């Protein structure tokens, strides 16, 4: 295997998944403050559950991947969608 791409099935080292999940969660937090989409109530509920269960941001992203895609697609947020795609394919 001569490819220098990190292999997530061997190690998550070098992928910086936690920091990228944190960044996506920051993007989500900003968006739900600015928006009145039907998704806002959904994500507020899920974020409250996340706090009660004390799960990390990467776990939340992995658990909510389809909902996050739908929400960021609705907003046409290309940066969030790109980051979400990266997280899904490299970290989850």
Curated annotation (Swiss-Prot):
<keyword id="KW-0535">Nitrogen fixation</keyword>
<dbReference type="GO" id="GO:0009399">
    <property type="term" value="P:nitrogen fixation"/>
</dbReference>
<dbReference type="Pfam" id="PF20543">
    <property type="entry name" value="CowN"/>
</dbReference>
<dbReference type="InterPro" id="IPR024899">
    <property type="entry name" value="CowN"/>
</dbReference>
<comment type="function">
    <text>Is required to sustain N(2)-dependent growth in the presence of low levels of carbon monoxide (CO). Probably acts by protecting the N(2) fixation ability of the nitrogenase complex, which is inactivated in the presence of CO.</text>
</comment>
<comment type="similarity">
    <text>Belongs to the CowN family.</text>
</comment>
<protein>
    <recommendedName>
        <fullName>N(2)-fixation sustaining protein CowN</fullName>
    </recommendedName>
</protein>
């Amino acid at each position: 295997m001569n490819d220098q791409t990190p292999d997530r099935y061997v190690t998550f080292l070098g992928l910086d998944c936690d920091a990228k999940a944190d960044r996506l969660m920051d993007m989500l937090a900003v968006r739900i403050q600015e928006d009145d989409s039907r998704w806002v109530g959904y994500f507020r509920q899920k974020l409250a559950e996340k706090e009660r269960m004390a799960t990390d941001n990467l776990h939340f992203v992995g658990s909510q991947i389809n909902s996050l895609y739908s929400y960021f697609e609705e907003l046409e947020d290309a940066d969030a969608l790109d980051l979400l795609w990266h997280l899904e394919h490299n970290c989850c």
